[in-house]
Every structure is written in C-alpha cells, then in structure tokens.
C-alpha cells in the first residue's frame, strides 16, 4: 500500500487565497437594510410624492372635470350670445391650456365689438365680457346712413332713419364706407363740437353738417349759406370770426374759415 504524504503547505496556501478573494468581494446589503436606509434618507418618500404628483398633474390636465363646460357672455346687445360663443369655441378645451387673449381675438375683428375680455374660473367656467360699439353719429354717403361710434368706427348701415335730434354728417364726396372702417376722427370731433356750440353759443342752427374730401367739415344754414371749417385747429378763432360776421349782419353765401385770413363771398343766386 502506497502512502501519499499530505500536501499541507499547498492546502494552507489555497485556503489563504480563498479567504483573500472573499475579503475583496463587495458586501451586498439585504433588502431590510436598503429599506431602512431609503426611509432614513427620504428617497423613498420623495419617490412616492413624485409619483403621486405625476398622477395628480395628469388628472388635472386631462380630466373632464377641468374642461370648459359653461360659457357666460356679458354685455352683448347687438350680437347674440350664441354667435359670440360660436366665434370663441371654448367648450371641451382643457381650462389650463386656454390662452385668454388669443381666444377672444376673433371677436375684435367684428365692427360691433370695441373690447372683449375672457376670464376663466375653476373648474370649468369661462366668462366673456363684451363692450360693444355704441352708435353716436350717423354718416350719410351715397344715400345710405351708417352708424358710427365715438371712436370713428363704422358699425353698420342704419336700419331706420335717424331721429330729428340725431347728428348726421353728410359726405358730399360720396366715398364708399363699410363696417369696421374708421373715419376721420378729427372731422367727427369737430362736427360734434359744432353741433353743440353753434346753436348754444352763437345762435346759428345748422341745416346740415357735412364733410368733403377737399374741404373738410362744413355747415349749411337755412339761408343756404355754406361755412367751411375744415379741421379743428384754431376753432376758437374761427368761431369768433363767424360770430362777428353774423352779429355785424355781413351778407355772405360762402365763408371759408380755413385760411389765416378767412374770406367770404356773397352771391344772391347761390353760386360760389
């Protein structure tokens, strides 16, 4: 029987190498330790809050509860609320994604609308406030009377003739006019001023207040006199000269107050 001496030295070396390898391998912590560490550092709580926030944000953005359902229109007189709602299609849109200024922009293209505002209220309400143009003057051209607001914007052709006390400016040039067009604001301001000042301060009651492309604003009297004011500059001086001529009894059929040195003509036959 053959005897194999034990290789003690080699076994010791092999054992030491195994121990050295085991000591260099990283220690993998268990799930309990990882859970305790996550709770202690707040990472788990932060993750839970983040997930809940994502779900809440998704719900708020896309839930039907936060989509516009009710649209209220305030201030509409000429325009029907139904037409306004149709022009601003808000129903069904997520309330968070509605641009208030852009939404009402189509309304501002209407000749009836001077101002439009949109306010949103959670969870599903929209309120449109309309400031409509109010007719202040009639502008007559080509035999048609148009309603004009104080800013000079043409609203529409008048459905009924103006009343006796309404201010009507007659365009002797017969220039074409359409809704939404803005007229000469200086001419409108001057015409309103003359309609008040002439009868109340000078005692002259105009038979007609008109406008001409070349002359500007003019007035015709019951005696078939034509008084040209042009524009509103130096209005006080023009009124003073007119008042003096009327008080003096100076006869004239045509008076031009536009030049620095106004002039007048008197032709009983009415020609100028």
From Swiss-Prot:
Classification via InterPro entries: Cell_div_FtsQ/DivIB_C, FtsQ, FtsQ_DivIB, POTRA, POTRA_FtsQ_type
Membrane topology: Single-pass type II membrane protein
Record topological domains on the Cytoplasmic side: 1-43
Record-annotated membrane-spanning stretches: 44-64
GO CC annotation: cell division site; plasma membrane
Biological process annotations from GO: cell septum assembly; FtsZ-dependent cytokinesis
Extracellular side: 65-272
Signal peptide: none
Domain POTRA: 66-133
Cell compartments where the protein resides: Cell membrane
Keywords carried by this UniProt record: Cell cycle, Cell division, Cell membrane, Membrane, Transmembrane, Transmembrane helix
Primary location: membrane
Family of this protein: Belongs to the FtsQ/DivIB family. FtsQ subfamily.
Function summary: Essential cell division protein.
HAMAP family: FtsQ_subfam
The protein's name: Cell division protein FtsQ
Organism for this UniProt entry: Chloroflexus aurantiacus (strain ATCC 29366 / DSM 635 / J-10-fl)
């Amino acid at each position: 029987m053959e005897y194999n001496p034990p290789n003690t030295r080699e076994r010791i070396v092999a054992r030491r190498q195994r121990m050295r390898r085991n000591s260099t391998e990283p220690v993998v912590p268990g799930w309990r330790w990882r859970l305790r560490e996550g709770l202690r550092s707040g990472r788990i709580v932060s993750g839970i809050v983040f997930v809940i926030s994502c779900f809440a944000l998704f719900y708020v953005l896309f839930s039907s509860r936060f989509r516009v359902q009710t649209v209220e229109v305030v201030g509409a007189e000429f325009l029907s609320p139904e037409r306004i709602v149709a022009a601003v299609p808000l129903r069904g849109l997520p309330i968070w994604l509605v641009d208030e200024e852009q939404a009402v922009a189509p309304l501002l293209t209407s000749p009836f609308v001077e101002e439009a505002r949109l306010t949103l209220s959670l969870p599903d309400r929209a309120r449109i406030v309309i400031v409509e143009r109010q007719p202040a003057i009639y502008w007559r051209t080509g035999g048609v009377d148009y309603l004009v607001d104080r800013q000079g914007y043409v609203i529409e052709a008048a459905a009924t003739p103006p009343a006796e006390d309404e201010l009507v400016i007659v365009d002797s040039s017969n220039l074409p006019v359409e809704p939404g067009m803005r007229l000469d604001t200086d001419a409108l301001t001057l015409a309103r001023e003359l309609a008040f000042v002439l009868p109340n301060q000078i005692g002259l009651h105009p038979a007609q207040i008109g406008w001409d492309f070349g002359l500007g604003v003019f007035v015709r009297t019951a005696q078939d006199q034509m008084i040209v004011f042009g524009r509103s500059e130096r209005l006080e001086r023009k009124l003073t000269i007119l008042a003096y001529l009327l008080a003096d009894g100076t006869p004239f059929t045509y008076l031009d107050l536009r030049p620095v040195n106004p002039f007048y003509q008197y032709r009983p036959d009415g020609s100028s």
